Amino acid sequence: LLCYIIIPFVISLSACSTIKDGPSVSETKYFSNEVDYPKWYADAPKKDDSAIYGVGTEYSNDFQFSVDKAMLSAKRELASNYSSYTSAMMKDFAVESGVLGKGVANADIERTTRLIVAKVNLVGVQRQNFMVVKEGSGFRTFVRLRFSADESNKIMLAEIQRNAALYAQLRASKSFRELDKQTNKIEEQKIS
């Protein structure tokens, strides 16, 4: 009989107690408002530098696609900065489709850029800075491109000079053919 009284009493007392199962864990998560990026990504060019710069950053689950998209973004910015000086036709297209992180959310990223730049040789674009970091299940790439107007002008001047030499040769051969033709006419008139 004592057993019937003590067991319910012990059970009722144990129901009022709390069980601690290890150190307390806070459910609060803290998020930073700042995004980590390389220092050079936001640095302004030196005042005496006449070059034009473009930066880009992109994310992808695929390493190479992350790099390609970041280069495309930097070129797009570079071209838009350059377009205030002139106008080239450049079409860029990038598509990514996939699962982000471990969730089931699908992301389709589609970008089309069309910048009109006519008769401009954009040779001389250099990748000045480059960095890839692991971010979640993918990769984030940061790129900084530099386009030196001075170097570009040297290249264009060399191309113009080469074309001028070719044009001079063409004119000289054309003039010689005309002279030869005129000489033949005179010879034919003397014979008739």
What are these regions (language model features)?
Residues C16-S192:
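Domain-level marker for long, solvent-exposed, non-transmembrane regions
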